[in-house]
From Swiss-Prot:
GO-annotated molecular function: RNA binding; zinc ion binding
Name used for this protein in its record: Gag polyprotein
Segments carrying motif PTAP/PSAP motif: 109-112
Residue span of motif LYPX(n)L motif: 128-132
UniProt keyword list: Capsid protein, Coiled coil, Host cell membrane, Host endosome, Host membrane, Host-virus interaction, Lipoprotein, Membrane, Metal-binding, Myristate, Phosphoprotein, RNA-binding, Viral budding, Viral budding via the host ESCRT complexes, Viral nucleoprotein, Viral release from host cell, Virion, Zinc, Zinc-finger
Entry keyword annotation includes RNA-binding: yes
Lipidation (N-myristoyl glycine): G2
Length: 536
């Protein structure tokens, strides 16, 4: 019997349940169909060495991730959950992935390091993600140590230089490190101190922490914290509409930030305070509290359970522990649910019916606007198969008039899916005439209309002349007949009577004076005939 070849892509599909569980731990949701599409069709086109069958090489994954997270129109925010899940699979592989992960090569030899004191921490290394300060550049150059090939690649567009090997050859260096370690244990560092050196503790063995900042696992296996920069917050606020104006777009932005940055409780409050108004923030927090579920899996209103899952006051969650990270994952999920629920407006079907296709708008873009209106103004999910009929009817009736008429005349319309209707609408849209063709058609129609009007006027004129000619012919015929009778002798003579024939009843045997049919009695006055004068 033949053997089937197992690839990273086929392996993930065989263990799809584990993949979804790992994605859930990253606060994201992945679909099998898009998983296959991105792996086999999208990411190979980035030209970074990604094979169509997938790979668990962290170097290649990091390069794909940098393309996905690219800011501006060149980024791919819809692929963020999928590449983050791929990275989690490769960084902390489950048992069924470990045979496919190449072993990490031993680190390159470095200068001898003196044994640290009992309270000293290992020498720190620069972060692989950008720090917004340039104080490191003032240090003298040191021998460069290449990062582990299994770790993520460095973004060459950032301001931070690659990590340098630190040689603690002096006792003063050790004293400084001990003092820094003591300070980090006593009180949490300020954002600037966090940027310069981070707050680093060894992670748990079963940790699945994402590699995105503010919480990020460094190349040396130490957890680093990078707070939001003021420039990021400023750009997010000024380059996106407000929550009241377009809740869907701002919710998508915050969801992307929650996925990629893995923010702490304080970071979430800073993010909400920057992007939302006070009233919007209170509404989001209220809806998030309603989404908390109890031990039975149902929504709960118990204050202790709500405060434990979604606290309004600063909790004592330690993100360096597994328990603390689990609390943060649940908090971010509830916060996202609150954003989605608070962004829904009261049901208003009139708003949905008011969404019509623009003159030059493509059917696909119109469908996206229509679905967004369903999400915003109705409690229905347009992606739900049960709502496909309603969305299809709205798509037909609210399309452009020329497209809507042709869609209504399609054969077997009831069996058409929404995708079929969109494809037909795209065909109709692409066959539309250009403005020049439309002007030419209108000009021809006007000329044809004028030609028809002239022909109709000429036809009516000919009919009028024909009718006038017939009347004149009848009149002339009457005159001619009268003249002919006058020439033949004037009035016609009365027929001659027999000797015994009555002139009144034309019967024989009596005369007119004795005719029994002739009325008797006095003769009445003869009516006078009135003559018309020229004045009348």
């Amino acid at each position: 019997m033949g053997q089937t070849v197992t690839t990273p892509l086929s392996l993930t599909l065989q263990h799809w349940g584990d993949v979804q569980r790992i994605a859930s731990n990253q606060s994201v949701d992945v679909k099998k169909r898009r998983w296959v599409t991105f792996c086999s069709a999208e990411w190979p086109t980035f030209n970074v060495g990604w094979p169509q069958d997938g790979t668990f090489n962290l170097g290649v994954i990091s390069q794909v991730k940098s393309r996905v997270f690219c800011p501006g129109p060149h980024g791919h925010p819809d692929q963020v959950p999928y590449i983050v899940t791929w990275e989690a699979l490769a960084y902390d592989p489950p048992p069924w992935v470990k045979p496919f992960v190449s072993p990490k090569p031993p680190p390159l030899p470095t200068a001898p390091v003196l044994p640290p004191g009992p309270s000293a921490q290992p020498p720190s290394r620069s972060a692989l993600y950008p720090a917004l300060t340039l104080s490191i550049k003032s240090k003298p150059p040191k021998p460069q140590v290449l990062p582990d090939s299994g770790g993520p690649l460095i973004d060459l567009l950032t301001e931070d230089p690659p990590p340098y090997g630190v040689q603690p050859s002096s006792s003063a260096r050790e004293n400084n490190e001990e003092e820094a370690a003591t300070t980090s244990e006593v009180s949490p560092p300020s954002p600037m101190v966090s940027r310069l050196r981070g707050r680093r503790d060894p992670p748990a063995a079963d940790s699945t922490t994402s590699q995105a900042f503010p919480l990020r696992m460094g190349g040396d296996g130490q957890l680093q914290y990078w707070p939001f920069s003021s420039s990021d917050l400023y750009n997010w606020k000024n380059n996106n509409p407000s929550f009241s104006e377009d809740p869907g777009k701002l919710t998508a932005l915050i969801e992307s930030v929650l996925i990629t940055h893995q923010p702490t409780w304080d970071d979430c409050q800073q993010l909400l305070g920057t992007l939302l108004t006070g009233e919007e923030k209170q509404r989001v927090l209220l809806e998030a509290g309603k989404a908390v579920r109890g031990n039975d899996g149902r929504p709960t209103q118990l204050p202790n359970e709500v405060n434990a899952a979604f606290p309004l006051e600063r909790p004592d969650w330690d993100y360096t522990t597994t328990e603390g990270r689990n609390h943060l994952v649940l908090y971010r999920q509830l916060l996202l649910a609150g954003l989605q629920n608070a962004g829904r407006s009261p049901t208003n079907l009139a708003k949905v019916k008011g969404i019509t296709q623009g003159p030059n708008e493509s059917p696909s873009a119109f469908l996206e606007r229509l679905k967004e209106a369903y999400r915003r103004y109705t409690p229905y999910d347009p992606e739900d198969p049960g709502q496909e009929t309603n969305v299809s009817m709205s798509f037909i009736w609210q399309s452009a008039p020329d497209i809507g008429r042709k869609l209504e005349r399609l054969e077997d319309l009831k069996s058409k899916t929404l995708g079929d209707l969109v494809r037909e609408a795209e065909k109709i849209f692409n066959k539309r005439e250009t403005p020049e063709e439309r002007e030419e058609r209108i000009r021809r129609e006007i000329e044809e209309k004028e030609e028809r009007r002239r022909a109709e006027d000429e036809q009516r004129e000919r009919e009028r002349d024909r009718r006038r000619h017939r009347e004149m012919s009848k009149l002339l015929a009457t005159v001619v007949i009268g003249q002919r009778q006058d020439r033949q002798g004037g009035e016609r003579r009365r027929p001659q009577l027999d000797k015994d024939q009555c002139a009144y009843c034309k019967e024989k045997g009596h005369w007119a004076k004795d005719c029994p049919k002739k009325p008797r009695g006095p003769r009445g006055p003869r009516p006078q005939t009135s003559l018309l004068t020229l004045g009348d």
